[in-house]
Swiss-Prot record:
Active-site residues, as the UniProt record annotates them: C328 (nucleophile), H426
InterPro entries documented for this protein: Class_I_gatase-like (IPR029062), CobQ/CobB/MinD/ParA_Nub-bd_dom (IPR002586), CobQ_GATase1 (IPR033949), CobQ_N (IPR047045), CobQ_synth (IPR004459), GATase_3 (IPR011698), P-loop_NTPase (IPR027417)
Family: Belongs to the CobB/CobQ family. CobQ subfamily.
TM helices/strands, residue ranges: none
GO biological process: cobalamin biosynthetic process
Role, per record: Catalyzes amidations at positions B, D, E, and G on adenosylcobyrinic A,C-diamide. NH(2) groups are provided by glutamine, and one molecule of ATP is hydrogenolyzed for each amidation.
Molecular functions per Gene Ontology: ABC-type vitamin B12 transporter activity; catalytic activity
PANTHER family named in the record: COBYRIC ACID SYNTHASE, DETHIOBIOTIN SYNTHETASE
Gene field: cobQ
Protein name as it appears in the record: Cobyric acid synthase
Species this protein is from: Methylocella silvestris (strain DSM 15510 / CIP 108128 / LMG 27833 / NCIMB 13906 / BL2)
Pfam families: CbiA, GATase_3
Length: 480
């Protein structure tokens, strides 16, 4: 089990790399994360949902997605509450304080899912959540040491040297956790190192001496890792490939942003530059496309969009002849009205949309979770993605759909001038034909590069990187 000294230390990436490395050695490997908190989710073949990090890890294993890979998924909503997804299905919502009372009931589901995976694999690589040293959350924990001890899984602790203070991260963890928890840790890894590793040899020795845990690896930065999707929204604030092409795509970062990995295939295109627009910034006037991504809290995010003045920027963008695409929650925002009579996303209410599409949306408790296959209505460009949304969108604008699904249903909407469009389908731009069609409309051309192939190459590169800087044979002995 890979646990971290904090969030964003690289746990998800290390698990994915280990999964691919051991798969390349001929083992049947599966990923597992007892509890994840993310609005970036993937749809499983049976209509459940798991964190997208586990979907990437499953890809690294060459395994089909399963709800058992991430039995508890928390999807943050407005305020301090979250939607609770257990073994792929929504079971309720809870405030942060109330969730502590849920955890004892969820441990059974976590261990059940782990047992199912263990029966099918030679090796399971487990990812913890957040920090192993959050002693205030230790009671009834199911994400880190609570799970590790219940399942008898050895732990490797990862620290992040890039953010500074890594010695204190590891030694401090040892000093605050219970001795019984510390005994589960079989060694530590230092991640994201830059420079000459010999200069940190004394640091590694000091950590080992003070913690009593052996050093299992000093992992340098891996350039190819940046090509893999980020799971957490604060990964959007760090340096990621954005291109330097002639087509500028502006993406506003809203508080409830979800499934933002829809952007990753566009980063692959040399003609594209992506500008992630943060609070306090304006939508750039030179953008050819403004893309509104998914949202877990659509009405609240629409209010935030207006507070930033981005509605004014967007109206000016449209007057200049710019293009707009809304995906899922972004699609809902582009319509005339959003209604949430049952308070599905928060307090019940209604909000005026941005009025760029002649549609309206009513949020309901029924959640659509399904693969989506079809083609563009305009040019027949094929796509393969998935739907994950609450409510339904309807109105005159739906008579001019963006997509035609394989079963003949119309999906999405396009404005009369063709410059504004919206859809519930995630993963559209993973398809070469869809990216080429979009870029042609924006005055560019597609590169012909396969997004799927780039992900596979990146996973192999990360696996080889870990093979070079960790003793994977020793890790296997720990697992046995």
């Amino acid at each position: 089990m890979i646990q971290g000294s904090g969030s964003d230390v690289g746990k998800s990436l290390i698990v994915a790399g280990l999964c691919r490395a051991y798969r390349n050695r001929g083992l049947k490997v599966l990923p597992f994360k007892p509890q994840n908190m993310s609005n970036n989710a993937a749809v499983t073949p049976d209509g459940g949902e798991i964190g997208r990090a586990q979907a990437m890890q499953a890809l690294a294993c060459g395994a089909p997605l399963s709800v058992d890979m991430n039995p508890v998924l928390l999807k943050p909503q407005t305020g301090n509450g979250a939607q609770i997804v257990v073994q792929g299905k929504v079971v309720g919502t809870a405030a942060a304080r109330d969730y502590q009372q849920w955890k004892p009931k969820l441990l059974g589901a976590v261990l059940d899912s782990f047992s199912k995976l263990a029966a099918k694999a030679d090796l399971i690589v487990v990812e913890g959540a957040g920090s192993a040293s959050e002693v205030n959350l230790r009671q009834n924990d199911i994400a880190n040491m609570g799970f590790a001890r219940a399942a008898g899984v050895p732990v490797i602790l990862v620290g992040d040297i890039d953010r500074g203070g890594v010695i204190a991260q590891i030694v401090g963890t040892k000093s605050v956790i219970a001795p019984e928890d510390a005994a589960m840790i079989q060694g530590f890894i230092i991640n994201k190192f830059r420079g000459d590793p010999t200069l940190f040899a004394d640091g590694m020795a000091f950590i080992a001496q003070r913690s009593g845990w052996p050093a299992l690896g000093l992992i340098p930065f891996c350039a190819e890792a940046a090509l893999l999707p980020a799971e957490d929204s604060f990964g959007l604030s760090t340096a990621r490939p954005k291109g330097r092409g002639k087509i500028l795509i502006a993406v506003p970062i809203l508080p409830g942003i979800a499934n933002f990995d829809d952007l990753d295939p566009l980063r692959l295109e040399p003609d594209v530059e992506i500008a992630m627009v943060r609070s306090g910034e304006v939508l750039p006037a030179e953008a050819r496309l403004v893309l509104l991504p998914g949202s877990k809290t659509t009405i609240a995010d629409l209010a935030a969009f207006r507070r930033e003045g981005w509605d004014i920027d967007l109206a000016a963008h449209v007057r200049r002849g710019g293009h707009v695409i809304g995906l899922c929650g972004g699609y809902q925002m582009l319509g005339r009205t959003l209604r949430d009579p049952a308070g599905v996303e928060g307090p019940s209410g209604e909000a005026a949309g941005l009025g760029l599409l002649d549609v309206e949306t009513e949020l309901t408790g029924d959640k659509t979770l399904a693969p989506a296959v079809g083609a563009s209505a305009a040019d027949g460009a094929p796509f393969k993605g998935y739907e994950m949304h609450l409510g339904r969108t309807f109105g005159p604008g739906c008579a001019a759909p963006l997509l035609i699904l394989a079963d003949g249903r119309r999906e999405g909407a396009v404005s009369a001038d063709g410059r504004v469009s919206g859809s519930y389908v995630h993963g559209l731009f993973s398809e070469l034909a869809q990216r080429a069609s979009l870029l042609a409309r924006l005055g560019g051309e597609g590169s012909g590069l396969s997004y799927e192939a780039s992900i596979e190459r990146a996973l192999d590169a990360v696996a080889n990187h870990l093979e070079s800087h960790m003793d994977l044979d020793h890790l296997l002995t720990l697992a046995s």
